[in-house]
Amino acid sequence: MLISILIAGDLVPHERTVPLFEAHKTDYLFGDILSLIRESDFSVVNFEAPIVLDKLTPIRKSGPNLYSSLAAMEVVKDAGFDMITLANNHFRDQGQSGVCNTLSCADSIGLNYVGGGKNLEEARKINYQRIKDKIFAFINVCEQEYSIAEDEYGGSNPYDLINIHHDIIEARKRADYVILIIHAGIEHYP
């Protein structure tokens, strides 16, 4: 039995695409790849920009402070993505409120997520999914920059080789397959 899982890279509503996300122009935004997303048995995308519901609350950091909206997340779900990854270098760009808004919006529209949480324990949670009678464990981590969760505040699951090792061992107890998604690299270099 063939199982198709699509894992896409960074999704950031930015500049000229913001009005398209706000207007829910899913077909226009995704074009020809929309059928690939929807025909996959399971699809995942990195939701790079935290959701702002009221006002911007940017943290102090080097580089841009990204943000998005509930409409952007609704477009992601409408496109057919089953899960978003949150372990990335921008998840805490809008502080704790951006983290909490993103998590609560995903919960409210029924969109699965992995790699982010209201604290480190939540951010490290493995996401288990049944896909065609097989259990998949998804683990998502990122480099330790400005977005990392701690015991007392939310953010992303940090890239920690010891924790990853233990998480994979734990995931293998319950899952047929383990998928580790790592968000890393130098900005603007593929």
Which positions does each model-derived feature cover?
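Active-site-adjacent helix-turn-beta-strand microarchitecture at beta-sheet edges
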Residues: 83-138
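Active-site environment of divalent metal-dependent phosphoester hydrolases
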Residues: 13-16, 51-54, 89-103, 120-125, ...
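Binuclear metal-dependent hydrolase catalytic cores centered on His/Asp/Glu-rich metal-binding motifs
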Residues: 18-31, 66, 130-180, 186-189
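Active-site-proximal segments of metal-dependent phosphoesterases and phosphodiesterases across multiple
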Residues: 55-77, 177-190
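Hydrophobic structural segments
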Residues: 6-7, 12-13, 66-74, 112-114, ...
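Divalent metal-coordination and catalytic microenvironments
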Residues: 10, 45, 86, 90, ...
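N-terminal active-site segment of His-dependent metallophosphoesterases
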Residues: 1-66, 166-170
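Surface-exposed amphipathic alpha-helices with a cationic face
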Residues: 34-38, 43, 77, 103, ...
